[in-house]
């Protein structure tokens, strides 16, 4: 079974490579994970187990759906497999925080593959507060690159995890996050934050004074792997920061699925809008034409 190069867990996407921590002294010790690790396709990792199958009676539930988050190259067959296993969407990383940050072109490939498989797509970014780019510039970098490559994004999720990566005074961190939220809204995007109670408290001090229309995608696992999964519902959510309800929950991390190592998520489907082709008029000199774009982003709308 092939395994891809990836960020093993979304909760630690831009620290330097580190060994797995086998002795976790407290519940959030799982933040000390492998990051940016290349996994040899022929290397057997016995501790990474196959993800449990989604029960058949939940694969077309009118109330909730399952998703995975991805930060690596995919193939059309990968997306077909996810669809056949009952998954409805993928969260795709579009900003790589390594160095000065750069647009992750793997996102284009995955969004197109997901669209062809009939899956929805959501875009998330892993920002870097130490980059010379401002928070607004990091949002703009992703937005402009997606648009230039035929992707019309409606919403964006901002990762706020791994406190050790946020090397700046707390006031600077808050302003950086606020700058990203403001920039995304100025571009007409809906905004979500990927975090947890612990991450949010450590990084922002529990900041709760921004707009309540920012969605929440929270993670809650007991440890990496299938044995560390929590229930695939949002019923364990407890209010923190400005949020009184959550939109998405990550309940499993570092699990084998369709030849990939992924994290698993669940979300309410009440208002979900799947990816679709949209048409835009483009007015050029002495002519008018139409441009087709894949529209992504719709969970929580």
Curated annotation (Swiss-Prot):
<dbReference type="GO" id="GO:0045087">
    <property type="term" value="P:innate immune response"/>
</dbReference>
<dbReference type="GO" id="GO:0003796">
    <property type="term" value="F:lysozyme activity"/>
</dbReference>
<keyword id="KW-0346">Stress response</keyword>
<dbReference type="InterPro" id="IPR002053">
    <property type="entry name" value="Glyco_hydro_25"/>
</dbReference>
<dbReference type="GO" id="GO:1990169">
    <property type="term" value="P:stress response to copper ion"/>
</dbReference>
<comment type="function">
    <text>Plays a role in the stress response to heavy metals such as copper, probably in a kgb-1-dependent manner.</text>
</comment>
<keyword id="KW-0732">Signal</keyword>
<dbReference type="GO" id="GO:0016998">
    <property type="term" value="P:cell wall macromolecule catabolic process"/>
</dbReference>
<dbReference type="GO" id="GO:0009253">
    <property type="term" value="P:peptidoglycan catabolic process"/>
</dbReference>
<feature type="signal peptide">
    <location>
        <begin position="1"/>
        <end position="15"/>
    </location>
</feature>
<dbReference type="InterPro" id="IPR051595">
    <property type="entry name" value="GH25_Enzymes"/>
</dbReference>
<protein>
    <recommendedName>
        <fullName>Lysozyme-like protein 3</fullName>
    </recommendedName>
</protein>
<dbReference type="InterPro" id="IPR017853">
    <property type="entry name" value="Glycoside_hydrolase_SF"/>
</dbReference>
<comment type="similarity">
    <text>Belongs to the glycosyl hydrolase 25 family.</text>
</comment>
<feature type="domain" description="Ch-type lysozyme">
    <location>
        <begin position="64"/>
        <end position="282"/>
    </location>
</feature>
<dbReference type="GO" id="GO:0007165">
    <property type="term" value="P:signal transduction"/>
</dbReference>
